[in-house]
């Protein structure tokens, strides 16, 4: 186990492309840290620099307090688990797990003991004499993890290890990986493009885009207090709703009404450089069917009428999709997010509310919705910064 520190780390290529820019990150001993972002954001490059598979252009990487920039991968005492299982097809499960210990010329009795202990942890004991071709996808991934665990390294590096599994198996393996990491207490860096994996697995999450760490925090911090429009739109499913707005002396003007902001929120916004244009973000679960809220909730809610275009029932909840006549919001960060997620401009003015299953709203119906004005976020449309979290000079 070890602390991993990336101190002003940069990665540039001869063609001038910069994959990672000035990354400052301390991964605590025993922490489960997730690197998440769209393709090409720099997350795998970061993992490869920690592993020693990519050279660091500038900055310093320290593992357990020791500078390792110049150390070969084999000398860093870390273990990697890849998207592809990378198992030897001619070897049994036992031989695959034992392989790194065999390379290290460990005594056969010690190898047998460590393989047995690892197989027990991963529930592979009954499969030790099978070949990879006789295993399911989930079992193969557990064998790949076993090969990493058996070495007792300082850290695990995992590069999208669940991508090849079907949806049901991914959920199962997510839980198994989380429990295993807590049990072993080994520092783990995990790369994924799947925000659900990021939010459910990590102690902390690093959202990356354009080679830059957009925000580093707990899953709750990223969801409740996104640093900017990119993080707000990337984290959460369905995504946060964004409405055009204008700041007033006491609050905001939205396409469907006026919002008075609490004095403390006004104070936080005032501490930021004054924006020319603002965008208001509201999570789908904070927009409710007004027929289902009580009198107290109505006091601080803004209500508005919309026509529902689509209703999706998910059992415990329903998603109500609607449009407004207001102009669509535009910002550099939201346009970039739409591009990386392949969203069409046809849906740029579509919004979604998450309501309880007892809502009687039907497709094509006009309905009164309400959102809690205390649960909105205000963003600078130009810089993308969240104006409702304290400004850092």
Swiss-Prot record:
Cellular compartments per GO CC = ATP-binding cassette (ABC) transporter complex, substrate-binding subunit-containing; ATP-binding cassette (ABC) transporter complex, transmembrane substrate-binding subunit-containing; plasma membrane
Pfam families hit by this protein: ABC_tran, OB_MalK
Domains as described in the record: Contains an N-terminal nucleotide-binding domain (NBD) and a C-terminal regulatory domain (RD).
Keyword set includes Transmembrane helix: no
Record-listed E.C. numbers: 7.5.2.-
What are the subcellular locations of this protein?
Cell inner membrane
The entry's protein name is Trehalose import ATP-binding protein SugC
Function per UniProt = Part of the ABC transporter complex LpqY-SugA-SugB-SugC, which is highly specific for uptake of trehalose. Involved in the recycling of extracellular trehalose released from trehalose-containing molecules synthesized by M.tuberculosis. Trehalose uptake is essential for virulence. Responsible for energy coupling to the transport system.
- InterPro entries to which the protein is assigned, alphabetical: AAA+_ATPase (IPR003593), ABC_transporter-like_ATP-bd (IPR003439), ABC_transporter-like_CS (IPR017871), ABC_transpr_MalK-like (IPR015855), ABC_transpr_MalK/UgpC-like (IPR047641), Mo/tungstate-bd_C_term_dom (IPR008995), NA-bd_OB-fold (IPR012340), OB_MalK-like (IPR040582)
């Amino acid at each position: 186990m070890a602390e991993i520190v990336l101190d002003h780390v940069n990665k540039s290529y001869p063609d001038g492309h910069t994959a990672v820019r000035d990354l400052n990150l301390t991964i605590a001993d025993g922490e489960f840290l997730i690197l998440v972002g769209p393709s090409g954001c720099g997350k795998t490059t970061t993992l490869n620099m920690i592993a020693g598979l990519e050279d660091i252009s500038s900055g310093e990487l320290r593992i357990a307090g020791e500078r390792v920039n110049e150390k070969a991968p084999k000398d860093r005492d870390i273990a990697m688990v890849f998207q592809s299982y990378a198992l030897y097809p001619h070897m049994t499960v036992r031989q695959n797990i034992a392989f790194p210990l065999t390379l290290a010329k460990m005594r056969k009795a010690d190898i047998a003991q460590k393989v047995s202990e690892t197989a027990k942890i991963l529930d592979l004991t009954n499969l030790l004499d099978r070949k990879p071709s006789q295993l399911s996808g989930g079992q193969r991934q557990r064998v790949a993890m076993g090969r990493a665990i058996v070495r007792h390294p300082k850290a695990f590096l995992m590069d999208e290890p669940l991508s090849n599994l079907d949806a049901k198996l991914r959920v199962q393996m997510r839980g198994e990986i989380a429990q295993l990491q807590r049990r072993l207490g080994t520092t783990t860096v995990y790369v994924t493009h799947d925000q659900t994996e990021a939010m459910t697995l990590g102690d902390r999450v690093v959202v990356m885009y354009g080679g830059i760490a957009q925000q580093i925090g707990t899953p709750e911090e990223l969801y409740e207090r996104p640093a900017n429009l990119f993080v707000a739109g990337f984290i959460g499913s369905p995504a946060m709703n964004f409405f055009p707005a204008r700041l007033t002396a006491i609050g905001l003007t939205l396409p469907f009404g006026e919002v008075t902001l609490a004095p403390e929120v006004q104070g936080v916004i005032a501490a930021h450089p004054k924006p020319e244009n603002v965008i208001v973000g509201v999570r789908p679960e904070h927009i409710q069917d007004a027929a289902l809220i009580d009198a107290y909730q109505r006091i601080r809610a803004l209500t508005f009428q919309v026509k529902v275009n689509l209703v999706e029932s998910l059992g415990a909840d329903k998603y109500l999709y609607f449009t407004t006549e207001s102009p669509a919001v535009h910002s550099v960060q939201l346009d970039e997010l739409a591009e990386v997620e392949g969203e069409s401009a046809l849906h740029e003015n579509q919004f979604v509310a998450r309501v309880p299953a007892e809502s009687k709203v039907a497709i094509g119906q006009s309905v009164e919705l309400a959102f809690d004005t205390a649960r909105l976020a205000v963003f600078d449309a130009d810089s993308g910064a969240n104006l409702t979290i304290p400004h850092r000079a």
